[in-house]
């Protein structure tokens, strides 16, 4: 459930596979779910390279992963695959926090992974000119401040002091955004593509929940009938 919630918001993803074990049943499941929820691009990291001495085994695992990606309509032959060890990179950085590019082979492999992500996964066009809309992913109560709803802004912008509507599940109600935060940084505004927390005036935690949306007043209405597509994941 958490994987689906997160993946549905992604511009791209990193598929991590153990180089020592190869693709596991959950690897297939994650690739399938990524395709079903519309993750457009993937980059692969073959982890635990330090546990594999046989270069042919690494090649075999890479081939398996590429075939699996192709089965689920990802471009398996073209997707970048980086081989390394997250643990070895963490150990190197823990021992020498000032490690820079070129100082350690394991750290360099992680940097190469991020370079591939930057190059292969395109930054999509953000719909910042459309009416503000954010699906509520989680809700928190902060003592002394109020209720914070978190989520990824799907479209538009939101500024501190603007009025919004809480739509869905319960009766639609209005409130004012008194704070916008992203990764513990206070912002003046958030925009499409940002994962933010919105502090909402006069709203209690029980007034809002996942499944509701926060939107520009009058821009969206709840419906009791809709058409949808269901994919039943079998074991």
Swiss-Prot record:
EC number of this enzyme: 3.6.5.3
Cellular component terms (Gene Ontology): cytosol
Entry annotated with the keyword Protein biosynthesis: yes
Entries under Pfam families matching the protein: GTP_EFTU, GTP_EFTU_D2
Enzyme class, broadest EC rank: hydrolase
Recorded catalytic activity of this chain's protein: GTP + H2O = GDP + phosphate + H(+)
Coiled coil: none
Residues reported to bind GTP: 47-50
Alphabetical UniProt keywords: Cytoplasm, Elongation factor, GTP-binding, Hydrolase, Nucleotide-binding, Protein biosynthesis
GO MF entry, a single one: GTP binding
InterPro entries, per database record: EF-Tu_GTPase, EFTu-like_2, EFTU_2, P-loop_NTPase, T_Tr_GTP-bd_dom, Transl_B-barrel_sf
Quaternary structure and partners: Monomer.
PANTHER family: ELONGATION FACTOR TU, MITOCHONDRIAL (PTHR43721:SF22), ELONGATION FACTOR TU-RELATED (PTHR43721)
Name listed for the protein in its UniProt record: Elongation factor Tu
Organism annotation: Gloeothece membranacea (strain PCC 6501 / SAG 26.84)
Highest classification ranks of the organism: Bacteria, Bacillati, Cyanobacteriota, Cyanophyceae, Oscillatoriophycideae
Gene this chain is encoded by: tufA
């Amino acid at each position: 459930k958490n994987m689906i919630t997160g993946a549905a918001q992604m511009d791209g993803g990193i598929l991590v596979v153990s180089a020592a074990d190869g693709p596991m049943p959950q690897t297939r499941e994650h690739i399938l779910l990524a395709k079903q929820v519309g993750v457009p691009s993937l980059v692969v990291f073959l982890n635990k390279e330090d546990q594999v001495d046989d270069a042919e085994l690494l090649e075999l695992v890479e081939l398996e992963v590429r075939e699996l990606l192709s089965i689920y309509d990802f471009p398996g032959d073209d997707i970048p695959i980086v081989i390394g060890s997250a643990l070895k990179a963490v150990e190197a950085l823990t021992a020498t926090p000032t490690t820079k590019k070129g100082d350690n082979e394991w750290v360099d492999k992680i940097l190469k992974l991020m370079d591939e992500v930057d190059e292969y996964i395109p930054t999509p066009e953000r719909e910042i000119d459309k009416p503000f809309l954010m699906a509520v992913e989680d809700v928190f109560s902060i003592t002394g401040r109020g209720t914070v709803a978190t989520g990824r802004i799907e479209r538009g912008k939101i500024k501190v002091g603007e009025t919004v509507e809480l739509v869905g599940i319960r009766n639609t109600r209005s409130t004012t955004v008194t704070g916008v935060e992203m990764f513990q940084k206070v912002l003046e505004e958030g925009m499409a593509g940002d994962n933010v927390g919105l502090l909402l005036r006069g709203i209690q935690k029980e007034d809002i929940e996942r499944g509701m949306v926060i939107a520009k007043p009058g821009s969206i209405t709840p419906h009791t009938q809709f058409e949808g597509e269901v994919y039943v994941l079998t074991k």
